[in-house]
């Protein structure tokens, strides 16, 4: 069997064997291609750590902004409920006046 370009595919050659030299050459090419692909696709640990810190900081800032919005929302809800309560009290007083007449 001979080796012709693909590590997963072996074909019969004249001698029937793959030489170590041929296999080493193909493996070296494969390793280089893999390293180039790996280098383009993945970052170093330091870059990943920096990215992780940036993401955490972003989440922290978003959390603070969300908490501030929730505080404002709670305050608006309380004001609205107080206003509704005051209106209902006023209606109750008016109804009491009308009933007393």
UniProtKB/Swiss-Prot annotation:
Gene3D superfamilies the record matches? 6.10.250.40
Per the record, the domain of life is Bacteria
Family recorded in the similarity comment: Belongs to the UPF0134 family.
* Annotated protein name in UniProt: UPF0134 protein MPN_675
Taxon lineage? Bacteria, Bacillati, Mycoplasmatota, Mycoplasmoidales, Mycoplasmoidaceae
